[in-house]
Regions:
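Serine-hydrolase catalytic core
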Residues: 323-403
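N-terminal secretory signal peptides and thylakoid transit peptides that target proteins
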Residues: 1-16
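Short amphipathic alpha-helix adjacent to the substrate-entry channel of hydrolases
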Residues: 196-213
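C-terminal catalytic histidine-bearing segment of alpha/beta-hydrolase fold enzymes
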Residues: 377-380, 392-460
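N-terminal cap/lid segment of alpha/beta-hydrolase-fold proteins
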Residues: 40-42, 49, 135-180
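Primarily recognizes the serine-hydrolase "nucleophile elbow" in alpha/beta-hydrolase
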Residues: 194, 198, 238-310, 342, ...
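Catalytic nucleophile-loop/oxyanion-hole region of alpha/beta-hydrolase
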Residues: 217-248
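Short beta-strand element of the alpha/beta-hydrolase
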Residues: 181-190
Length: 460
């Protein structure tokens, strides 16, 4: 395979047994020793890699293993078997994996199909602004072998991280390496609380001043998703405008799950927000989750505005059937109970977010096999409101067959289809097939970046 001169190629150091490094079965010498060739061997996580195998025995089985450490408490690993062509080469973007962690053709299959190796210890955790080394090893049964270590990054070189605790605002600000001013994005986590750091780092790498904003389960913030005031987010926007001074005064908000619900609520409530991206969101408000603050005897809601609790779907819901969920099952599949709630049309109307008030474009992203909650149905509520009110700005709903609750940026493992919730310790199903969720990630993320860029252009 021919690669342009401008392509920066990483050629692996190798260990090649004599039996596998001589001539091909047909007696023709191979062009060189076994090697793994990769363009841009140091790149952002959301960038696909082109990977080639070269110099292996022709028409032979070659197994490739990918391992990454530094992502949590254990390493992640995948493998796949390919067949080389008559020249002893294989382009992994086009080659069929006929065995391994995934099957078929998937250019980045070795990355999304990684599984956590619970019986192994990981190395030291990598800094969010550092590199995550990925080791690729390729070997044939004849003994030919090659290895290369590559770097994946959430933050490009020069991106800075600043932990924020100012004026009551808590979070982490990522700033691009390039001179400002930069457009700004607020990034919101879901029902686990804390700050959603990874996409904020990636967005800073793409030119945005990105504030991963906490709103509960961080020092100085509530312990639960209970009675969170909209005024807190207004204060965060004021702080961001004064600190970052966003280019063209552009501020977008991105949220996932309950954070997606929140992103839609904020966009409908705060006129300074110019665009919203909501991952696996809800177009209706849901109720509180987790503990109230000591001494807070107010009625419990997730969100308040000017001291008033905002109505939520579960409040006085006449059709909810809690028996629709088997609480003894592990992992728990919750979507069924939410579908029973949606049958109460009055409750849906009371709790619907007036998303049509948003002063900018809206992008909704959902998975049709979401077990956490029916994100497609919930996002459609917002989409239909935008349609019904003839929203004057662009809006779209990207929905993906077979994808679960874990839609995010691409080329990271999607094999964990359940998780232990950090608030209540229970195990929930995310739903989705790993390959389908990976496909949703790969398709949606470039559209998110294009959406933000288009929204910025409208401000100029």
């Amino acid at each position: 395979m021919r690669v342009t001169r401008r392509a920066f190629l990483a050629r692996a150091t190798l260990a090649c047994a004599a039996a596998g490094a001589g001539c091909s079965a047909a007696g023709h010498p191979r062009p060189g020793p076994p090697e793994i060739v990769v363009e841009r061997p140091d790149d952002l996580v959301d960038s696909p890699w082109s990977i080639w195998l070269r110099g292996f025995p022709p028409a032979s089985r070659v197994e490739v293993t990918a391992t990454v450490a530094g992502w949590g408490r254990a390493p992640w690993r995948s493998w796949a078997a390919f067949e080389t062509d008559s020249s002893g080469e294989a382009a992994l973007a086009k080659a069929t994996a006929f065995a391994g962690s995934y099957r078929g053709v998937s250019p980045m299959g070795l990355f999304w199909s990684m599984e956590r190796q619970e019986d192994e210890k990981a190395g030291p955790a990598m800094a969010l602004t550092g590199a995550f080394p990925v080791t690729l090893t390729a070997g044939s049964r004849g003994g030919a072998r090659a290895e290369i270590t590559l770097d994946r990054r959430l933050a490009s070189a020069g991106v800075t991280r600043r932990d924020v605790q100012a004026d009551g605002v808590v979070g982490t600000l990522f700033t691009p390496a390039s001179p400002g001013p930069h457009p700004a994005v607020i990034v919101l986590a879901g029902s686990g609380g804390g700050a959603w750091l990874s996409p904020a780092a990636l967005l800073a790498s793409r030119g945005y001043a990105a504030l991963a904003l906490g709103y509960f389960r961080m020092p100085g913030l509530p312990h639960g998703l209970v009675n969170i005031p909209i005024e807190y987010f207004e204060a965060a926007i004021t702080w961001l405008r004064e600190t970052v001074r966003p280019r063209e005064d552009f501020i977008a908000v991105i949220g996932v799950s309950r954070g997606g619900e929140l992103a839609l609520l904020l966009a409908a409530s705060i006129p300074e927000i110019n665009a919203v991206v909501a991952y696996v969101p809800s177009g209706v408000l849901f109720g509180p989750f987790g503990p109230s603050e000591p001494g807070d005897n107010r009625p419990r809601a997730a969100w308040t505005h000017r001291g008033r609790p905002l109505p939520h779907l579960g409040e006085n819901n006449r059709t909810v059937d809690w028996s629709a969920v088997d609480q003894k099952r592990t992992p728990i599949v919750e979507r069924s109970v939410y579908l029973t709630m949606l049958r109460d049309r009055d409750a849906v109307e009371r709790s619907s977010i007036p998303i049509e008030r948003t002063r900018g474009p809206v992008l909704l992203i959902s998975g049709k096999d979401d077990d956490q909650w029916p994100s497609f149905d919930l996002a459609q509520i917002a989409y239909r409101r935008l349609q019904g009110h003839r929203h004057p700005y662009p809006f779209a709903h990207l929905s993906y067959e077979g994808a679960g609750h874990g839609i995010t940026f691409p080329y990271t493992p999607t094999t964990s289809t359940s998780y232990v919730h950090p608030v209540n310790g229970r195990t929930y199903s995310l739903g989705g097939h790993p390959a389908m969720t990976a496909g949703a990630n790969a398709d949606s993320w470039p559209k998110v970046l294009a959406f933000l860029e288009d929204a910025r252009r409208q401000r100029r």
